[in-house]
Amino acid sequence: MFYHGASANQHWIAVDDLSKVPVDVDHYNVVPFQFRRAGEYKEPVLSGIVELDEVKFVVSQSDAAEQWQQLTAEDGTVWRSRAYHGKLGKYSDMAVGAFNKVLNLVRGAETFDIALVTCAYIAMFYTLFNLFARMRAVGSKVWLGLSTLVSSFFAFLFALYITTRVLDLSIPFLSLSEGIPFFVAVVGFNNKILLAEKVLQNQLNAQSSKNDAPTVLYQALREQGPLLLRDHLFMITAFLGCSFYASYLDGLKNFCILAALILAFDILTTSTFLSAILSLKLEINQIHRSTLLREQLEDDGLTETTVDDVLKSNSLAGTKTFTDAPSTLVTVAKVAGVSVFFGLHFYGFGSAWLSDLSAGNETNDTFTLYDAVADQIPIGSNGTLVTLFPTRFFLPEKLSTQIEAVVLSFIGLISTAARDKYISKFILFAFAVSASINVYLLNVARIHTTRLEDAIELKKPKKKASKTAVSVPKAVVVKDSETTKSSEILHSSSESESEQSSRPLEQVIELYKDGKVKTLVDDEVVSLVTAGKLPLYALEKQLGDNLRAVAIRRKAISDLADAPVLRSNKLPYLHYDYDRVFGACCENVIGYMPLPVGVAGPLIIDGKPYHIPMATTEGCLVASAMRGCKAINLGGGVTTVLTKDGMTRGPCVKFPSLKRAGQCKLWLDSDEGQEEMKKAFNSTSRFARLQHLQTALAGDLLFIRFRTVTGDAMGMNMISKGVEYALKQMTEVFGWDDMMVVSVSGNYCTDKKPAAVNWINGRGKSVVAEASIPKDAVVKVLKSSVKAVVDVNVNKNLIGSAMAGSVGGFNAQAANMVTAVYLALGQDPAQNVESSNCITLMTETEDGDLKVSVSMPSIEVGTIGGGTILDPQGSMLELLGVRGPADVPGENARQLAKIVASIVLSGELSLVSALAAGHLVQSHMQHNRAAAKK
């Protein structure tokens, strides 16, 4: 408010306290207003106004001006008053104006220029489309592509600021609209895409080296960073050279400088912002894999403790790099960066009270307004008081302003609600919770790993005191000959145990009944076992220490079976992770059986070389496979085709009559029955999916063969759970309440037995592998001829097997290869029975080369669960690159089946060639009859 005294010599002064102003002064209201977004609309004609530039002033003694909400122009346009904070209409007007400007430029441009710019825009949009398409192929639908664009946009903003503000160069919008499409099309995003591909590929490969996300990212930057730096520096040099060469063309020179700065800042944003996004993507992938592995292992029937132990081993624990060690330089850099960031924001926040520039501007504006309207305000006899209202804006009533009004009304409602004393506190609390959750998610991989390790440590037993611990003697250097003596005792009683006299058996039994088995010494626990008071199988549970349980069981069985060999080191048991064995792989454990492991290869399978591990005690088996691999590689390697994937389980059910059994068979064979059973079965697992039901009737017995995909697990436990539930639904929901389940497995599967149903319909993975061997390789490597090899294969593998009435045994030694690979890779060795079903075909091509193929309809393998959770077997799966679950469920198991078929092919080729050349006996005498050492 402003006051002017009655004298003409006085001036207008600002008034804060009305008590200093006479009561009977004349009072006027000054209301400034503007008409915005007029466009083609006419403004209302008003009388008694003062106009200054775009601002109009209404001077009135009444409050009518304050009540103005709506004005009508001569053309009927309705203008509504509002605070000019909404900008939807403004942006729409800007868009329309920009479109009109572009349209005018197009009309005035030459045809060639229009075509050139159009091609540039097409190339730019294609580059953007290619960015998202390639990122999608990498494994990100939207976010990595969007993050790449944001990274480049930040580089553009930084470069634009430096160019226009620091270098004071003019970059017209027209130059940007014409130059940016060419720039994007030429530079592209190839280096960033390659970086993302390298990062995600390194993570897949890192499962063998267990690197964490920072290490994986660091390795990718080391590999891809120099290429990014080389390309960007080359283009920066080119743009700067162009700016010097075309210095007389200001527009081109300025844009070239801008482009060079964009590339320079792009290096910075790629190595900071985009790298951070990639690191987050890595950790999210790690969490996804851990969750997927946990669910598959639990579906496969493993205990929670075993699952946690496997997850700990398979987590990206991380190898040491410079990022792991505490670095003073890195810490100082981080603190300095954060300090500068907050300092700049604090300075910006405090600039108003540091310089007070805004106050000066406001004062100048106020007196400018006073000078413009002072002549229109009469001075009263007792002075005049003027109230200056905020500027009021009038906008034409059109669609954009109506939408804007609705949006502003909604925002205003939210703003009012947010200021409520209760709602504001709730929002603050929700913000705190949200921030905490986001911090948790950003560190979720490390938190996940840490908590997993802590949980495993809690579940593992505490270390015992010296008197109850497994006694391990100090290492003693002995001669090689001494290590084979049966009298060598690996574990003798500890000093504390020997010094302490054993308590009477009755006292030991009382301590056992009181639950104090852990406090007993080893010999006392052995006495409980030999007395029949403590079962052998309960040692792990009672002692809470798996390793100690194994040691005591060895001593107990040594006494019970009078087998002192168990007190020697002939059957080792130390240095083994029994936590994975207990509840998953074996019971009543007394040690582990070392097997020699050889490697055959490299064998090229579908264009990729593999070194295939084989655990065997048969001499010349690995050598035979190696010879086959060499011959196959000379022909270009193995080509494989997977024709079917489905594990089976065949329960047997019984009905009161043949009629009811037949009705159930018809229902199961119908589309309705298949669909109902699929719904019931699929509800039991995320991974098991029922493919088909096959039925067979024998009297009133009905055999149902469930064929199911089971992801990367071999799937017997997973599918059994689904079968039990589906049969339960049949009796309780589907109307077959008179059905009785005879057995969940009715041998119609068929598991671990030779059966025509597996040979005909397949079980597990059905794979066909083929290779073409040059005739020169047959002669030089296999030491035979194509004709002789083909002849032996027909007479032996086909006619000979037919004469024997074989089912699926039309091969030379498929079981040899399958079993050796299964033992090395943690597969079920008993399933070599059906997995070894194979027919080997060999023919001579028109060129005289040898074509070999093996067809194996029932390879039963998995890359999670079972023996694959053990570290030695798991490490061999890592050697093949198929350990654990794949990103595409089931892909690792399918690839493993192809590897098995391929090594069988090499073994078949080598053995048949040896038979054709008459070398079989000679090779076995050389490799399998080595003289025993004395």
Curated annotation (Swiss-Prot):
CoA binds at residues 624-630, 781-783, 923-924. Coiled coil: none annotated. It is found in: Endoplasmic reticulum membrane. Its EC number is 1.1.1.34. Residues 133-141, 190-231, 278-334, 443-934 are cytoplasmic. GO terms for molecular function: hydroxymethylglutaryl-CoA reductase (NADPH) activity. Residues 113-280 form the SSD domain. GO terms for cellular component: endoplasmic reticulum membrane; peroxisomal membrane. The active site is at residues 618, 752, 828, 924. This is 3-hydroxy-3-methylglutaryl-coenzyme A reductase. The gene is HMG.
